[in-house]
Amino acid sequence: MRLTPTERDRLLLFGAAELARARRARGLRLNVPEATALIADTVCEAARDGRRLAEAIAAARAVLGPDDVLPGVADIVTEVHVEAVFDDGSRLAVVTDPIGGGLGDQAPGALLPGPEHTEPEAVVRVLVTNTATVPVSVTSHFHFFEANPRLDFDRAAAYGMRAAVPAGSSVRFGPGESVEIGLVPVGGDRIAIGFAGLVDGPLDAPGAKEEALRRAAACGYLGVEQR
């Protein structure tokens, strides 16, 4: 018997669903693969019977309840996608909340958000002007002193500082745009390596700031002169 890959997948799904039916008949509560297979197979069989997409999805939602599955399964299987062949062609059926009765935040292993992190208040505010013809973005933990050379701001005031924005975010400066931004000191060991190469070591080492300003001036950075 020659089968297409789609037909082989259908037989695999049917086999898993039959196993789920047999275990359910023995009084066992289904796990995630078993529940998923049974729900998906119900859609495919409804399509084979000539039922429409909405009817197939409704049948899949009715096949299992919270008491038919192991604890936590309803919170894991929140959506099942399966491609089934209907009378008018192949359709992707999306069965949302197929089991119902999920415990939400009370489910075993649920991920709960921690307390909201409050960013520190800015200790320095500088006016930044983007003189470039393209937008410039600076990420939260970039040493702001070493930001794009075409950004015009008080570099000396920004030495050892980063943008006072949430971690992982960035601040964007449009072409010709002037924006006042708050800065906070770089934390931790205060060692800057990489970035634009203006600093390569401890930020607070003797002479480090003066050397960084000299390098910035030599490389044509705007805003090197303290205003």
UniProtKB/Swiss-Prot annotation:
Name of one Pfam family that matches: Urease_gamma
MF terms in GO: nickel cation binding; urease activity
Superkingdom field: Bacteria
E.C. code: 3.5.1.5
Urease beta as annotated region, ranges: 102-227
InterPro entries in the cross-refs: Urease_beta-like, Urease_betasu_sf, Urease_gamma-beta_su, Urease_gamma/gamma-beta_su, Urease_gamma_sf, Urease_subunit
Annotated disulfide bonds: none
Start and end residues of each stretch annotated as Urease gamma: 1-101
Subcellular location(s) per record: Cytoplasm
Catalysed reaction, written as an equation: urea + 2 H2O + H(+) = hydrogencarbonate + 2 NH4(+)
Main location: cytoplasm
Keywords attached to this entry: Cytoplasm, Hydrolase
NCBIfam families: PRK13192.1, urease_gam
Family assignment from sequence similarity: In the N-terminal section; belongs to the urease gamma subunit family.
Cited PANTHER family: UREASE
Oligomeric and partner information: Heterohexamer of 3 UreC (alpha) and 3 UreAB (gamma/beta) subunits.
The name this protein goes by in its record: Urease subunit gamma/beta
